[in-house]
Amino acid sequence: MNFSVLPPEINSALIFAGAGPEPMAAAATAWDGLAMELASAAASFGSVTSGLVGGAWQGASSSAMAAAAAPYAAWLAAAAVQAEQTAAQAAAMIAEFEAVKTAVVQPMLVAANRADLVSLVMSNLFGQNAPAIAAIEATYEQMWAADVSAMSAYHAGASAIASALSPFSKPLQNLAGLPAWLASGAPAAAMTAAAGIPALAGGPTAINLGIANVGGGNVGNANNGLANIGNANLGNYNFGSGNFGNSNIGSASLGNNNIGFGNLGSNNVGVGNLGNLNTGFANTGLGNFGFGNTGNNNIGIGLTGNNQIGIGGLNSGTGNFGLFNSGSGNVGFFNSGNGNFGIGNSGNFNTGGWNSGHGNTGFFNAGSFNTGMLDVGNANTGSLNTGSYNMGDFNPGSSNTGTFNTGNANTGFLNAGNINTGVFNIGHMNNGLFNTGDMNNGVFYRGVGQGSLQFSITTPDLTLPPLQIPGISVPAFSLPAITLPSLTIPAATTPANITVGAFSLPGLTLPSLNIPAATTPANITVGAFSLPGLTLPSLNIPAATTPANITVGAFSLPGLTLPSLNIPAATTPANITVGAFSLPGLTLPSLNIPAATTPANITVGAFSLPGLTLPSLNIPAATTPANITVGAFSLPGLTLPSLNIPAATTPANITVGAFSLPGLTLPSLNIPAATTPANITVSGFQLPPLSIPSVAIPPVTVPPITVGAFNLPPLQIPEVTIPQLTIPAGITIGGFSLPAIHTQPITVGQIGVGQFGLPSIGWDVFLSTPRITVPAFGIPFTLQFQTNVPALQPPGGGLSTFTNGALIFGEFDLPQLVVHPYTLTGPIVIGSFFLPAFNIPGIDVPAINVDGFTLPQITTPAITTPEFAIPPIGVGGFTLPQITTQEIITPELTINSIGVGGFTLPQITTPPITTPPLTIDPINLTGFTLPQITTPPITTPPLTIDPINLTGFTLPQITTPPITTPPLTIEPIGVGGFTTPPLTVPGIHLPSTTIGAFAIPGGPGYFNSSTAPSSGFFNSGAGGNSGFGNNGSGLSGWFNTNPAGLLGGSGYQNFGGLSSGFSNLGSGVSGFANRGILPFSVASVVSGFANIGTNLAGFFQGTTS
């Protein structure tokens, strides 16, 4: 493993994972103790042998014994020195480890950096997070460099320490002078063979006895390893259940060669020991014998320290409640870990018994954050799981929901593959039973992607019966009166010089539109009905005065550029058919307009209109498309019935009170020269031949004419009768040509007309026109003309006061008029019309001053209109022709800025206004039938509008004084009763239609939306989930969620990472209804029931520390 290329997630995790420096410290202590024991043994051995030689044992044998023992005593002394040196090197290694642990980046910081990166990338829809993402990545690179530097220093220090260790010399295998046949052990081998015991081949057998075992030679269920006897062991040669390690006898031990339950370490005998070589219960350290000892090489109960014998306190740790606890903060018995609630826990913050892992709720768990029993993995909800993140039992794999799954992320039972939903699936990502292939739906599939499901939704063939909607009677009702309270608008001033920068409206493309053919049902009958009467109440508008001197600052409207518009060619569908129909008769009731009087003395204060500058306008050349073709068509026959217009009389004595218009000063107006564009081309056409000789009209001058006051006498016109006139058919007008006609300039001088009066003009007889019939006719013609109109300058003029008398019209009748069908012989071709570009120069209109003036009172008497009847109008069936237009392109048009000078709005005062009530009687409509209309499919081509550019401009400052509106009351409005007409809709046939189809392809699970594959149902998030409704990564169970960047969890409705149990919130939480308060990237380590905080176990604990 090359740490220099590993990311900081792995390097930091490797340093902070595991047991930390404690095993090395224990090893250093053990080596130190071994050195002392070896030195003591060497001194004791030398003393004993020398005592024997110099004392009780004399002779040759004594000398031979001393010679044989001397090498062994020397080896013991050398081994003691080497053991002491090894202890020193172990202490140096601890220092190196502590240094690198301090130097590397904390894993939670790396996880937070990656979580922030994921959050920024997911929300980076428009690239707005690019700087923040770059900063996050730069910090991540610094973390990478820091970890590589720390690991390099650690590697160098560890290598130096390891190279300083010298290998131990091999101890003596045989005593000096021992016969070879005895030293070789041949008698033992001979005895074994003689007994007939066969020698076992090296290595375990590959056959398992049980369910869901991974490995070989296992007896039991859910073991992962070799030659385990029991259930859920992770390792080799274990006897028992839930062990994590090798050669353990018992259950829930985390380590090697332990005998007992819940030991964390190696070579322990007993229950709940934390360390190595302990014998007893709940010892913490090395080589202890007894109960609840903390330290090394103690013999007794509750001792704290090293190499002690005796009985100490009931608890050797601190803050415990119970007996024989060697850890701290425990509640219970024989706990060697810290913060536990229960019995025999060697891990930390467990709720239950004999847990060697951390943060578990349950019993005999060697893993961490489990809710259940005998779990070796982490964050499991269930029992006897050697994998992690499982909800169920006996799962050697991870993230499974179910039982006996040796694969990963399965939902079901006995699945050997991964991401399966079902039972006994050996392949991967299957839904069903006994599938050996991959991504199948069903049973016993061996291929890939077999058994997909297809569904389609099809409507049946339906015929809707005719629908008759009867008339509905709506009784008369009145809307309630509405009162609008007085409203006060405070004075306000907009900020000056608000600048709006130039901007462009984006281009717009309208896609092609397809309108399918449609036919309305024939003969929809609408029964006769009447619109209800309506009464509008009198309206009182109180007096109001606008605030004086509202000031609007000078401002300029920005320039506007309209882009060229491309209107594609279009063709209307041919043969749109409209069936014959008749419009119903319509009766308009008599309308009474009551008398009304405008209030007198409406005063408008003096004001000035600001100067206005109109910029020069450039209208580019434009050309209409040539050859617009209108297909032949026939207009239907149209019958207009006779129309009776009753007599009408305008009210007499309409009085306009005297008033004075204010003085009006019109400033000089400068209209610059204008030139029409040259080369206006009208496509040629011909009038029939017509010969008129040239006519020359000389200049005509009319001198000033003055007409004084005069009176016209009464004028009597006798009865005039125009006889019937018949124009015969077949009249033909031959072709003719109009020559050019030239007129000289004509000047009309000033004409004045004095005051005069017109007498009453009228007639008291009826005017009657005979029936007029216009037969069908055709007009073939071609029109050509050319004209030139010189400049025309009208002089100023004035009109003095005049009065007109009453105008009286007698009754008259319009007879029925029949227009027969006529035909326009096609095709009719309109040639192209070219209009060249021309310029309109700028026009400067200076300010106009208007003095204050008063509007007079105007009175109108009541007006009554008689009843007016329109009989039905009949229209025959007709067909609209096809119309084709060529593509039209409009050129770009630019409108320059328009400047407006500052100005002040005058004060306006209006007195109260009262309108009289108005009543509209009901309007009657006879029944009628809607025709059938058929339209073929219509397809419109795409239309693109290019961007429109606006230059920057500045908004003027506007100041308004306070405005207060008086209360306004609207009286009730009455609506008379009416009946909706009956409506008949004929039957409609709906053919069978397929609305849509969907398929469930072969793949893992059902209705999952996770990024990576998941099994189960309704799972989302990063993927690798199983179960139901989980959102995240590596989850199992029901409705669990882990935030982005976190992995694993099981149970029901948990939110966080590395959690198990039910309804927990936080990471590193197990049990029921617990809440961890640390960030989700950090394990809160909470177990038990309803706890809130961090590092808690038990029931209903609460802390924020």
Curated annotation (Swiss-Prot):
Source taxon at top rank: Bacteria
InterPro entries on file: Mycobac_pentapep, PPE_dom, PPE_sf
GO aspect biological process, one term: response to host immune response
Q: Which family does it belong to?
A: Belongs to the mycobacterial PPE family.
Q: What is this protein called?
A: Uncharacterized PPE family protein PPE24
Q: Which organism is it from?
A: Mycobacterium tuberculosis (strain CDC 1551 / Oshkosh)
User: Lineage from the top down?
Assistant: Bacteria, Bacillati, Actinomycetota, Actinomycetes, Mycobacteriales
Name of encoding gene: PPE24
